[in-house]
Amino acid sequence: MYLYARDDVPVTIYYAYKQSEADEQGDSVQASTGWETMLSAIICAGFCITGTWPMRTEMTNRSVASNTNALASSIVLVCRKRAQDAPSCTRRTFLAELRRELRPALTRMQTSNIAPVDLAQASIGPGMAVYSRYAKVLEADGSELSIRKALQIINQELDAYFTEQEGAIDEASRVCIALYSQYAFNELSFGEADVLARAKNTSIAALVRLELASAKQGSVHLLDRPELPAFTARSEESLWLVTQQVVQALQEQGVKGCATIVSSLRRIAPDSVKALAYRLYSLADQKGWTQEAYVYNSLVVAWNDIQTKALDTSKTERRQGSLLDFGA
């Protein structure tokens, strides 16, 4: 393939990724052995990987995909010939360039509503673009940074990207995310929960007041979605609450129910709900909480339809308001 490739035309390679190719250590997926083998072959052949992107090629009604997060796409790898005189670089240079280039790419992907289940694979493109433009990436001891290690670093940067997004979230929601990441909706001791809450500059009492958690007999747990109150204007005190209410609406009422909530938002930007869904998908996926990951993935996949329906709902409400004013 390399021999017949032209310098001025990119090469595209289609790869059907399997969920079972993950190499798991503990609760987190470290790197895909399938990706490692594929990328190693491409880079060793002399190509530079310039992008990866998912394509909708798999049937969502397959038995393996029913109510799961089975990848709904194949991956397209875009490659070009690497310069014969490509230099080497240090791990430090690789990390600096990765952080500078990966985060804007992730923002563009989120804006395009790429499914969370596909985001980790799509993020490999801009990450490997940095790695593969060099002949070698060298560790401090002079050894070569392996593709496996590069993939792990890219995954770590993906986690860091989502973690940084929490900085703009209200304190109560940040506590909920911290509790969820460790305990989901299960109980923990009041003492442990209190330490987490105080670290985020709030309290368990505040979470109870906002109807985000229950605290009884020395135990605390996040309220599961069926336990949460219905959406009201007060819900907007917490991004966590609104996001969970939208997820619950999608499960019970579909896109229309979600659109009713989204069209009513005044203080919370709708895209903040989508961004938190990405983060919660990532947490649930790392923990192996399949059903939890599924609901957040479903929300992002449906987001364009939700926004369209929400816009229609807002227009209808404005027209009705104008008619009432005219009649008065």
Question: Can you name each region flagged by the protein language model?
Answer:
Residues 26-33, 37, 44, 54-72, ...:
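Class I S-adenosyl-L-methionine-dependent methyltransferase catalytic core
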Residues 62-114:
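Flexible, glycine-/basic-rich loop-and-beta segments that form/coincide
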